[in-house]
Amino acid sequence: MIRDLVIVGSGPAGYTAAIYASRAQLNPVQYEGSVTAGGALMTTTEVENFPGFVDGVMGPVLMEDMRKQAARFGTELITDDVVEMDLKGDIKTIKDGSGNVVQARAVILAMGSAYKKIGLVNEDRLSGRGVSWCATCDGFFFRDQTIAVVGGGDSAVEEATFLTKFASKVVLIHRRD
C-alpha cells in the first residue's frame, strides 16, 4: 500500500507535521527513532519559551503530549530508525531498521539537528547544568555571570552578541589559532 506521507523525526517539527497531516486526513506514518522519541527536548528540564505554558513545561512532558496528540488524530507511530531512503521519483521508499519498507507519495524530514560538541570532560553530564547549545533558550539562566561561547563562525558571534543582554561578561573562544 502506498501511503500519502511519511514523517521522519519526532521532535516538535515532526509531531506538528503529524498533527496537521492527520487532521488533513493524509494518514501519515511517523518514524520516531528506536531510542528516544521526542527529539532534543527530551533532555531539556524546563521549557519556558513555548507559547501557552505561562509557568513553563518540562521538555519530556511537552513531547509526550505532542506524541499523544499526533496519535489521537490517527498518525501511525513507528518506533524504529530509518536506515535507507530513496526520495527520487513520484513514489518514495523508506526502509527501517527492522527491514520494513514503506512507500509514500511525500516525505517530510524533521530530524532536527545535533549540536557540535567540543569533547570536554563531563560535557554530556553538564549539558543543561551550565553547558548549553542555545543562547536564545538558556541565556536568561546565566544573568550577571561570565559566559564563554566556543566557535568561530557567524553563529558563534551571533550567540555571543545575544548573550551580552544577560551576562556580565562574554568570552568568545575560537577553536583554531
Range-by-range predicted roles:
Residues 16, 38, 117-118, 158:
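Glycine/Thr-rich phosphate-binding loops of Rossmann-like dinucleotide-binding domains
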Residues 30-43:
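N-terminal glycine-rich anion-binding loops that anchor highly charged ligand groups
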Residues 98, 107, 111-134:
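Glycine-rich beta-alpha-beta "Rossmann" dinucleotide-binding loop(s) and their flanking helix/strand
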Residues 42-101:
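N-terminal Rossmann-like dinucleotide/flavin-binding domain of flavoprotein oxidoreductases
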Residues 1-3, 96-106:
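Core beta-strand elements of the Rossmann-like FAD/NAD(P) dinucleotide-binding domain
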Residues 2, 7-33, 127, 133-177:
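Rossmann-like dinucleotide/flavin-binding elements
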